[in-house]
Curated annotation (Swiss-Prot):
Binding site for substrate: H14, D16, G170, D279
Enzyme Commission number: 3.5.4.4
GO molecular function: 2'-deoxyadenosine deaminase activity; adenosine deaminase activity; zinc ion binding
Gene3D superfamilies per UniProt: Metal-dependent hydrolases
Listed name of the protein: Adenosine deaminase
GO biological process: adenosine catabolic process; hypoxanthine salvage; inosine biosynthetic process; nucleotide metabolic process; purine ribonucleoside monophosphate biosynthetic process
Pfam family, one: A_deaminase
Residue positions of the active site: E200 (proton donor)
Length: 332
């Protein structure tokens, strides 16, 4: 199912959406934070999906307990470190971990730049110990407004040499991309790549904004592109990568079921698209799960799965030399 000769990657993976339940429990008790449960078993439903949520905003509430326990920068570093361990244990050769520094900082008034530093330090520590390559993507959480996003951007740009790209995430309907035009001009001027959550809760127009105004060369989710033939044609022609997260789309009620997910329509249209986990801690999945459901629920062949796997490598925010090295590693 997963082709061992092709690098296995996960490009849309939220670091702050992947905090182990045991870690939440331990950090909560360590810092005297009142948790909504009296045991690990009772805590799980508060931080993991037990079925489907009504919408994206309800889904995102599951993440709130994951950041509520980040009481100091050591906790942030621990979570970042454990994310690398988790990714490596799932057999990933390469991962892009994305995080929102303000979202991680806000509950305990941590310094935003300090959060960025702690994430970088935690990831570096994990990479030193495990056979995996990791790049970081900063997030501006649009739900908190333009000023908070500016503060996030400042913290990220202070460490731009350790970050490969910037993302826009959060309430897509309430905070459209054009509110962040100036933010992303600074991102591009700094030489960072751009991806954006778009076409998930909102329609195709959100994706056009992400591409034409923000400068996105990749789109997170993008399921609603299928309603705009011109957009589908544009995505294919210009090789705009779609970071597809099928199980997450099901959990947020973005799609009703796997068999109606537009993944196949993207592939049939020649769009560059790969599989990702999104918030694996919330969805309680790994990347292998996504390949399994695409095969069993959507009827993809092993050859088609290999194409998706290869697409992920081609979409990755890395240099051509690093890409060649990643392929060479699997060829040994």
């Amino acid at each position: 199912m997963i082709d061992k000769t092709i690098p296995l990657v996960d490009l849309h993976r939220h670091l702050d959406g992947n905090v182990n339940v045991k870690t939440i429990w331990e950090l909560g008790h360590q810092h005297g934070i009142q948790l909504p449960a009296n045991s690990l078993e009772e805590l799980a439903p508060f931080v993991q999906i037990q079925g489907k949520e009504n919408n994206l905003v309800d889904f995102l509430k599951k993440l709130d307990w994951m950041v509520a326990v980040l009481a100091d920068l050591d906790a942030v570093k621990r979570v970042a470190y454990e994310n690398v361990i988790d990714a490596a244990s799932q057999g990933l050769d390469y991962a892009e971990l994305r995080f929102s520094p303000y979202y991680m900082a806000m509950n305990h008034n941590l310094p935003i730049e300090g959060v960025v530093e702690a994430v970088i330090d935690g990831v570096r520590a994990g990479v030193k110990e495990h056979d995996i390559s990791v790049n970081l993507i900063g997030i501006m959480s649009r739900s908190f407004g333009q000023e908070k996003c500016r503060l996030e951007l400042e913290g990220i740009l202070a460490h731009r040499d350790s970050i490969v790209a910037m993302d826009l995430a959060g309430d897509e309907l309430g905070f459209p991309g054009d509110l962040f035009t100036e933010h992303f001009k600074r991102v591009r001027d700094a030489g960072l790549q751009v991806t954006a959550h778009a076409g998930e809760a909102a329609g195709a127009e959100s994706m056009w904004q992400a591409i034409n105004i923000l400068g996105a060369t990749r789109i997170g989710h993008g399921v609603n592109a299928i309603h705009d033939p011109k957009l589908m044609e544009y995505l294919a022609k210009h090789r705009i990568g779609i970071e597809s997260c099928p199980t997450s789309n099901l959990h947020t009620s973005t799609v009703k079921d796997y068999d109606v997910h537009p993944l196949r329509k993207f592939m049939d249209a020649g769009v560059l698209i790969g599989l990702n986990t999104d918030d694996p801690g919330v969805s309680a999945i790994d990347i292998a799960h996504e390949y399994r459901v695409v095969k069993s629920e959507m009827g993809f062949s092993d050859s088609q799965l290999a194409t998706l796997q290869r697409n992920g490598v081609e979409m990755a925010f890395m240099s051509d030399s690093d890409r060649k090295a990643l392929y060479a590693k699997k060829a040994k």
